[in-house]
Amino acid sequence: MSMQDPIADMLTRIRNGQAANKVSVKMPSAKLKVAIAKLLKDEGYITDYAVASEGNKAELEVTLKYFQGRPVVETIQRVSRPGLRIYKGKDELPKVMGGLGIAIVSTSKGLMTDRAARLAGMGGEVICYVA
């Protein structure tokens, strides 16, 4: 069976891994998934990520982050999905948890956080919320 929404699968693997107190989670790799992992690392939500190639299949391993035994990622939620794309202009970009969380936005300049997109004066597709 083919995977309908690989980004939702990635976010669910991270959510489930942290609920089970796993050190890391593995998933099939893709450019968009690596870009999301890079943003999560830059914003301090995960410890690290690595891409390993096994034959013709690349695998993304995300090392999860905990603070005092609790997951750093409290909520991670898919917004735009294949059946219902959500686009927001630069003035309509949401502030997640009043600015404490981030929204990952796909713009014409690549993936960036909602703060970076506002500073760049760009809108785009809202991929997910992380808090």
Swiss-Prot record:
Q: State the superkingdom.
A: Bacteria
Q: Which UniProt keywords apply?
A: Ribonucleoprotein, Ribosomal protein, RNA-binding, rRNA-binding
PANTHER family the record matches: 40S RIBOSOMAL PROTEIN S15A
Q: Matching InterPro entries, A to Z? A: Ribosomal_uS8 (IPR000630), Ribosomal_uS8_CS (IPR047863), Ribosomal_uS8_sf (IPR035987)
One Pfam family linked to the record:
Ribosomal_S8
Recorded family membership: Belongs to the universal ribosomal protein uS8 family.
Describe its partners and assembly state.
Part of the 30S ribosomal subunit. Contacts proteins S5 and S12.
**GO biological process: one example:** translation
Could you identify this protein by its name?
Answer: Small ribosomal subunit protein uS8
